[in-house]
């Protein structure tokens, strides 16, 4: 199971990468995509949507289930990944197939998320 060291993680199995411009990429972890199975569709809220921490920003639909996606921190969606038209990219490379890019309201919130070691412990690795 791949768990990159340079990302932050949530207990809901989302990852977040803070960028230099104050925005962040958000996606689902390798663990999440493997638990979901074959992802067939991703539905996300529109660009410009303001999110509270832990608020749903969309869903991922797999062959046997639908799972909510939760904002790791508060902020505003500024973009969604155009590659998600082919939802299987999330299974193939979950850490490059980001779901949304968001403007983070409080960068300190990102630091409060789990680091790679804590996430490994959470999933029993």
UniProtKB/Swiss-Prot annotation:
Q: Which family does it belong to?
A: Belongs to the GcvH family.
Against InterPro entries, the record matches this protein to: 2-oxoA_DH_lipoyl-BS, Biotin_lipoyl, GCV_H, GCV_H/Fam206, GCV_H_sub, Single_hybrid_motif
Q: Which NCBIfam families match?
A: gcvH, PRK01202.1
What's this protein's name? Glycine cleavage system H protein
Domain Lipoyl-binding as annotated: residue spans = 23-103
- Which cofactors? (R)-lipoate
What is the cofactor note?
Binds 1 lipoyl cofactor covalently.
> What's a single GO BP term from this record?
glycine decarboxylation via glycine cleavage system
Annotated organism of origin = Chlorobium chlorochromatii (strain CaD3)
- Tell me, what does this protein do in biology? The glycine cleavage system catalyzes the degradation of glycine. The H protein shuttles the methylamine group of glycine from the P protein to the T protein.
Keywords, in A-Z order: Lipoyl
In-chain residues carrying the UniProt-annotated modification N6-lipoyllysine: 64
Q: PROSITE patterns of this UniProt entry?
A: BIOTINYL_LIPOYL, LIPOYL
- HAMAP family noted in UniProt: GcvH
Q: Name one GO cellular component term.
A: glycine cleavage complex
What is the gene name? Answer: gcvH
How it assembles, according to the record, is: The glycine cleavage system is composed of four proteins: P, T, L and H.
